[in-house]
């Protein structure tokens, strides 16, 4: 498909004008069909969950703040009724059902959704090395990975990653604490405080004036020249993806504890901010495994970086970048500032994702301020992308397509997945808050 031909498409023209759009995915095929395209299944997610469990004693020792959750890194699921009322008042549109916030923004260690996938891939690599060199067995107490002799062993190896910020933060901190030498290749969008935090752990931060794609490519290139360097590939990694996917079974458990039903008459809608796609893609995969066709997964992207929407809509996936259409990929949502989506995630998930929408930067600041005022919860701009999702779902076309009745909608649960912000320094947060209009 020629780019010139694409530019004649009225929907693409809206993207090129940076208009906010909503697109209901006609390729969405139901869980039975959709899962067959992924190339992974529930046993892979279960293995990831078991690996995280094996590392629980390690976390209790290395990060004492995780002791209260017995070494399991999991985020709170909280009701945001005041925010719901404020959204209804401000947008003059109904939100039926309950509105909850999944606070991955406040996950331990790195304060973002990347504490799921990024940390998991570092653990998988550390475990592989430790098992191969007979330092541990799978039945051992993994807290011994804190011992100096094992840290010395890991220091012979290095890890590299390209990132807009949060993935680098999770991999950098986790890798450094285990003893690895870590290099994080940071794109121009990365926040200064994230670079400083990494340096405080002894991580080598390599800065670029270009965007995310360049940082990843350079990280990959640097790792190739060193046989002891492991490159974590945010664009193609199934290991990262599986780390995120464990969120599905964890959420199911939280629902059981909170008495929240998900079935035909109690649909679940989850709104996930999307950058390159690994985090939201992996979480959506886990959600579909856990809740089947009763969960609807909607991706939210900035108007200036709609890479996954563009890839899935055109079917070109990683063969097209937003810049090919003159879209600049410059956004306040630094975690979502990605011009070319993951080809792996796009192809794996295009039959499981129910919809996409875009949101302008100013709304992210407005919603950030509103959440702070109503619920006293502070997030970074990227994390607010999902907040207007429930307003889009009221669209009659969406309800018709999925045969959702008003009664089912009244029983629905909406989850806004808050992807980051828990570690933002106060000075930076005050800047964000000053940019909101209400």
Swiss-Prot record:
Disulfide bonds: none annotated. One of its GO terms (biological process) is D-serine catabolic process. Its EC number is 4.3.1.18. The modification N6-(pyridoxal phosphate)lysine is found at residue 114. It catalyses: D-serine = pyruvate + NH4(+). One of its GO terms (molecular function) is pyridoxal phosphate binding. Its cofactor is pyridoxal 5'-phosphate. Pfam families: PALP (PF00291). InterPro entries: D_Ser_am_lyase, Ser/Thr_Dehydratase, Ser/Thr_deHydtase_PyrdxlP-BS, TrpB-like_PALP, TrpB-like_PALP_sf. It is an enzyme of class 4 (lyase). Keywords: Lyase, Pyridoxal phosphate. Belongs to the serine/threonine dehydratase family. DsdA subfamily. HAMAP family: D_Ser_dehydrat (MF_01030). This is Probable D-serine dehydratase. It comes from Histophilus somni (strain 129Pt) (Haemophilus somnus).
């Amino acid at each position: 498909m020629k780019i010139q031909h694409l530019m004649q498409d009225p929907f693409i023209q809206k993207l090129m004008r940076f208009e906010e759009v909503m697109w209901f995915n006609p390729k969405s095929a139901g869980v039975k069909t959709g899962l067959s395209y992924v190339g992974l299944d529930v046993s892979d997610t279960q293995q990831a969950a078991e690996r995280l469990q094996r590392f629980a004693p390690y976390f209790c020792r290395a990060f004492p703040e995780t002791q209260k959750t017995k070494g399991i890194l999991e985020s709170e699921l909280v009701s945001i009724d005041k925010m719901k009322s404020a959204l209804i008042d401000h947008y003059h549109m109904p939100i039926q059902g309950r509105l909850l916030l999944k606070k991955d923004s406040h996950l331990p260690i790195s304060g973002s959704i990347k504490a799921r996938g990024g940390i998991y891939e570092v653990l998988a690599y550390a475990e592989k090395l430790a098992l191969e060199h007979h330092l541990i067995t799978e039945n051992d107490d993994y807290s011994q990975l804190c011992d100096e002799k094992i840290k010395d062993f890991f220091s012979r190896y290095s890890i590299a990653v390209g990132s807009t910020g949060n993935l680098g933060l999770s991999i950098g901190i986790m890798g450094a604490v285990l003893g690895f030498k870590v290099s994080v290749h940071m794109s121009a969008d990365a926040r200064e405080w994230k670079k400083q935090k990494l340096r405080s752990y002894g991580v080598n931060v390599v800065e670029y004036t270009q965007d995310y794609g360049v940082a990843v490519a350079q990280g990959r290139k640097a790792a190739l020249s060193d046989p002891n360097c492991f490159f974590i590939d945010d664009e193609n990694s199934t290991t990262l993806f599986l780390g995120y996917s464990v969120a599905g079974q964890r959420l199911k458990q939280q629902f059981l504890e909170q008495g929240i039903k998900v079935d035909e008459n109690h649909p679940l809608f989850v709104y996930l901010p999307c950058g390159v796609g690994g985090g939201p893609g992996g979480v959506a995969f886990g959600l579909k495994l856990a809740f089947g066709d009763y969960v609807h997964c909607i991706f939210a992207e900035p108007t200036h970086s709609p890479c996954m929407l563009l890839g899935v809509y055109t079917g070109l996936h990683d063969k097209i970048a937003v810049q090919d259409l003159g879209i600049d990929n410059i956004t306040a949502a630094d975690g979502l500032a990605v011009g070319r989506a993951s080809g792996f995630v796009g192809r794996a998930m295009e039959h499981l994702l129910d919809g996409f929408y875009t949101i302008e930067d100013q709304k992210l600041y407005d919603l950030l301020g509103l959440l702070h005022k109503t619920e006293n919860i502070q997030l970074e701009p990227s994390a607010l992308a999902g907040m207007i999702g429930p307003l889009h779902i009221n669209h009659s076309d969406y309800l018709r397509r999925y045969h959702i009745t008003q009664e089912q909608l009244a029983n629905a649960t909406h989850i806004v997945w808050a992807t980051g912000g828990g570690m933002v320094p106060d000075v930076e947060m005050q800047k964000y808050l000053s940019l909101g209009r209400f």
